[in-house]
Amino acid sequence: MGHKATVELVLDCEEPKRLAKFWREALDYRDYYTDANLAVLVPKEGIASPLLLQAVPEPKAGKNRMHLDIVVDDIEAEVHRLQALGARRIDEGVQSFGGTRWVRMSDPERNEFCVSTGIEW
């Protein structure tokens, strides 16, 4: 029998409830569970990994070693939508490599993520 694993994405943050508001709108997710130290968001439809926002006492320091990519068809439209929700654009212009295009951004607590056209598999 093969090994089966699933992935839950966890972001450390200062204020889970506040940050959940941003990610709920950014990903079109819904609330599953929320308290002062943890917010769990799940997809409204379909199959995707849940996102857990976990309160930690230490402030963010340095660049994330791992980040989320939000894959869309229209990068600029999505960047503008996310900026209206409180995201910040890190780079000017669009980066590209191997047919993939992306813009680096950060959420309201400075967690980095990308808006990308995705990789064609």
Which residues make up each language-model segment?
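Short alpha-helical
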Residues: 18, 48, 77
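Amphipathic alpha-helical segments
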Residues: 15-30, 82-84
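Short, solvent-exposed loop/turn segments that connect beta-strands within catalytic domains
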Residues: 45-48, 61-62
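Vicinal oxygen chelate
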Residues: 2-14, 32-33, 40-42, 49-53, 57-82, 101-106, ...
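Intrinsically disordered, low-complexity boundary segments flanking structured domains
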Residues: 27, 36-42, 54-57, 74-75
